[in-house]
Amino acid sequence: MDSPSPENPSGTNSPNPKSPQITGSRLSHRPAISQRPDLDSNTRSTPIPDDEHGADLPMTMSASVVLSSLPRDAHRALADAEAVDTGKVTVRFQPLPSAPILKNRVFKISASQKFETVVKFLRKKLDCKDTDSVFCYVNSVFAPGLDEGVGGLWRCFKTDDQLIVSYSMTPAFG
């Protein structure tokens, strides 16, 4: 009969799938990688399915437990926040060095529009080709995303009740 050896404590010469084999190249304090056959070979190529979540429906203030007990100031603030995006805001275009200058620099736009509309309007006023680039910056500080709301930008970054949009044909900042 074979006696158990330190490498094979079970005393048999067949490998035991439940106990990892320790080889000279593998450290004893690291776990062995188990080699188990996949039950379904199709699971490797199929992507993880997306969760099917329905869109959250907006909740009226009367249906909400939290919003129905807010103080009057909060109700007024919510109404003011909704009202800002219904009016018009003033946009002032400022050319950066080497940018063409507009004859009229001040325009009004609906607060509910996206910043993309401002960029398209500016491109039209500057007679840009499809291949020309226009870089726009709010207050000469940052370039907002095209999907940003003009009303939100105006509310947060207005100067003298105007949204200052600097523009250039080449990248001006960072």
UniProtKB/Swiss-Prot annotation:
Q: In which compartments does the protein localize?
A: Preautophagosomal structure membrane
Region (Disordered), start-end ranges: 1-57
Listed under subunit, the entry gives: Forms a conjugate with atg5.
Instruction: Give the GO cellular component terms, alphabetically.
Output: Atg12-Atg5-Atg16 complex; autophagosome membrane; phagophore assembly site membrane
Give the family per the record: Belongs to the ATG12 family.
Output the Gene3D superfamilies linked to this UniProt entry: Phosphatidylinositol 3-kinase Catalytic Subunit, Chain A, domain 1
Q: Which residues form the Glycyl lysine isopeptide (Gly-Lys) (interchain with K-163 in atg5) crosslink?
A: G174
Compositionally biased tracts (Polar residues): 8-26
Which UniProt keywords are given for this protein, alphabetically ordered? Autophagy, Isopeptide bond, Membrane, Protein transport, Transport, Ubl conjugation pathway
Question: What does this chain do?
Answer: Ubiquitin-like protein involved in cytoplasm to vacuole transport (Cvt), autophagy vesicles formation, mitophagy, and nucleophagy. Conjugation with atg5 through a ubiquitin-like conjugating system involving also atg7 as an E1-like activating enzyme and atg10 as an E2-like conjugating enzyme, is essential for its function. The atg12-atg5 conjugate functions as an E3-like enzyme which is required for lipidation of atg8 and atg8 association to the vesicle membranes.
Q: What GO annotations for molecular function exist for this entry?
A: Atg8-family ligase activity
The record gives the membrane topology as: Peripheral membrane protein
Would the keyword Methyltransferase turn up in this protein's UniProt record?
A: no
Q: Which gene encodes it?
A: atg12
Q: What is this protein called?
A: Ubiquitin-like protein ATG12
Entry's InterPro entries?
Atg12, Ubiquitin-like_domsf
Q: Chief localization class? A: membrane
Cite a single Pfam family from the UniProt record.
APG12
Q: Which GO terms describe its biological process?
A: autophagosome assembly; autophagosome maturation; autophagy of mitochondrion; glycophagy; piecemeal microautophagy of the nucleus; protein transport
